């Protein structure tokens, strides 16, 4: 069965991709959940138009992402959190906490889903946090976690 994906499907593809799947998978899972539509000639032409517009937008987004990466490059962010005597935090620092601290430090607004915490931040100290702004642009933010 030939389908056009309307949403990101792990292991299958991204929106706009034309994929070949088993009939049951397409009919019983992808189409009812609106992850995909049937691949007709009209739908394929529409997808091609959308892909052309998306590629033009990607060029603009790349420039914007590089601009934001430049702003984040020299930014030092302090995060105040409650901690015990040994420096262990009560809870852990989340991506939303990092975004809030970056905004408070005068940095640009970020999407919390773009912030990657490789290891959970559960103690005081200095950390480097990666921010994926674009598939080709990743910025790093220096984060200092201090005791409240």
From Swiss-Prot:
Alphabetical list of PROSITE patterns matching this protein: RIBOSOMAL_L9
Superkingdom as given in the UniProt entry: Bacteria
InterPro entries: Ribosomal_bL9, Ribosomal_bL9/RNase_H1_N, Ribosomal_bL9_bac/chp, Ribosomal_bL9_C, Ribosomal_bL9_C_sf, Ribosomal_bL9_N, Ribosomal_bL9_N_sf
Single GO molecular function: rRNA binding
Gene Ontology CC entries for this record: ribonucleoprotein complex; ribosome
Keyword set includes Nucleotide-binding: no
Matching Gene3D superfamilies: Ribosomal protein L9, C-terminal domain, Ribosomal protein L9, N-terminal domain
GO annotation (BP), single: translation
Key words, A-Z: Ribonucleoprotein, Ribosomal protein, RNA-binding, rRNA-binding
Keyword Glycoprotein: no
NCBIfam families tied to this protein: L9 (TIGR00158)
PANTHER family reported in the protein's UniProt record: 50S RIBOSOMAL PROTEIN L9
Functional summary from the UniProt entry: Binds to the 23S rRNA.
Family that this chain belongs to: Belongs to the bacterial ribosomal protein bL9 family.
The protein's name in its UniProt record: Large ribosomal subunit protein bL9
